[in-house]
A protein has these predicted regions:
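Non-catalytic N-terminal regions of enzymes
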Residues: 1-160, 189-191, 196, 202-204
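A short acidic-Thr-Gly-centered motif at the start of a beta-strand
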Residues: 96-101, 164-179
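Short Lys/Arg-rich basic patches
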Residues: 179-193
Length: 205
């Protein structure tokens, strides 16, 4: 089985490399240390619901496409820098990685496989599976997404569905975004800065 990349994802395989991995990370911080074996079982269950993630990226005659492969997604303890390279041309490997470190469950994914919404739903499913397996005595309820996602939704080309060149551009001058100052790091050097902010204070601004 194979499926084409959506329009927004077509450029990612062409521009990715060791200096720009096109990988993003979502994570969940628990109140307890993560058990790797239980997390693996939770991932196995999640893959049954998200079989489209069990794919490798292949290059066709004219375009890239995703090909289903019977590769097991394996949980790893975090050792690599965040958002390390996942897609390497001619290497038949899955385009995401689940890892853990102390209390944190990480989900990293190559952007051509899914967008932020798909990644968020997958991580929610993964963490829910983990908590149910880790605490059977609590009889935790299984919570389904408010909007049930079908296989068709997971394959949806949102770019084609919602983008239109006919919509007039907004000529109203908007306030410029905040620009970070200082010396830039090279892409291969990634530093993680964690900040805790008050939502109330942000809303007041």
């Amino acid at each position: 089985k194979w499926r084409k990349l959506d329009n927004a994802a077509l450029a990612f395989p062409l521009v990715t490399g060791k200096d720009d991995t096109r990988v993003f990370r979502f994570y969940c911080q628990l109140k307890e240390k993560v058990d790797g074996e239980i997390l693996q079982s939770a991932l196995d269950q999640a893959m049954e619901k998200y079989p489209l993630f069990q794919a490798v990226l292949r290059k066709g005659l004219f375009w890239f496409y995703l090909e289903h492969r019977s590769l097991r997604a394996v949980v790893k303890q975090e050792t690599e820098p965040p958002c390390s390279r996942l897609y390497i041309p001619d290497k038949k490997s899955l385009l995401f990685q689940v890892s853990y470190d102390k209390n944190r469950i990480n989900f990293e994914v190559f952007h051509a496989l899914t967008d932020g919404t798909g990644a968020m739903h997958f991580l929610q499913e993964l963490v829910q599976n983990y908590l149910i397996l880790a605490h059977p005595e609590s009889n935790l309820p299984r919570i389904e997404n408010a909007e049930e996602i079908t296989h068709g939704d997971k394959e949806e080309d949102s770019f084609s569905q919602y983008y239109s060149s006919d919509i007039p551009k907004d000529k109203e001058k908007k306030k410029a975004a905040v620009k970070l100052k200082g010396e830039k790091l090279v892409h291969s050097d990634m530093h993680i800065t964690e900040v805790v902010l008050s939502v109330k204070d942000i809303h007041q601004r």
